[in-house]
Amino acid sequence: HKTLETLASVWMALSTQGATRHSLLINLGGGMVTDLGGFAAATFKRGISYINIPTTLLAMVDASVGGKTGINFNGLKNEIGAFAPANSVLIETEFLRTLDTHNFFSGYAEMLKHGLISNTAHWAELLNFDSSNIDYAALKQLVGQSVQVKEDIVEQDPFEHGIRKALNLGHTCLLYTSPS
C-alpha cells in the first residue's frame, strides 16, 4: 500500500542494507510499487537513483513513466509526492501474460486515452486490437507507442502546468471509485 508506514519500511530496508547516495533502487511491480519506490528513492538521502520495471499494463503505460511519485496520505490519493523521473524504465511485455482481465483492461483504457490525445493512426490501431485473442507481439508495439505518447507530453510539460494535464483525463472520476 502507498502509505507512510510502507514508505518508512522501504527507507528502513535501504538504511539497514547500507544504501548510500550512490545506491540504485530497483522497483519491480505495478504502479503502487513504482509510485512508492520512486518516492522512496527521491527522498532517501536527498535522492538516490532508481529504475522501474513495471509488471502491469497500466504501470507500463502510465505509472512508471513521467516521474510522478508519491504516497496516499490522510485519506487522499497521491497527497504527498515529488516529480522524480526514474533513471531508466525497463519494459518487458512478457509480464502481461500473467494479468487477469481486470488488470489488462485498466491498462488498455489508459492506452485508449493516449490514442485519443495523440493521433488517428494510433487510435485506429488500438480500436482494431483484438483484446479477446491477444496478439502479444502487436501489444508490445502498442505499448511502445503509448509510452512514446506519454513521454512526448511529459517532455513538453514535466511539472504538469499545461498540456500534461491531458494525461489526467478520466483520473479525477476514477480516483473516487478505485481502492487506495
State the predicted function of each range.
Residues M32-G38:
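Short glycine/serine/threonine-rich phosphate/pyrophosphate-binding segments
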Residues G38-F129:
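A glycine/threonine-rich phosphate-anchoring loop and its flanking beta-alpha core
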Residues I134-L175:
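Oxyanion-binding "anion nests"
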Residues N27-L28, I53:
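Structural motif
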Residues L28-G30, G170:
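Glycine-rich beta-strand-to-loop/alpha-helix junction loops that act as flexible
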Residues Y176-S180:
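Conserved small/polar residues in nucleotide/adenosyl-binding loops
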Residues H1-L24:
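ATP/NTP phosphate-donor binding region
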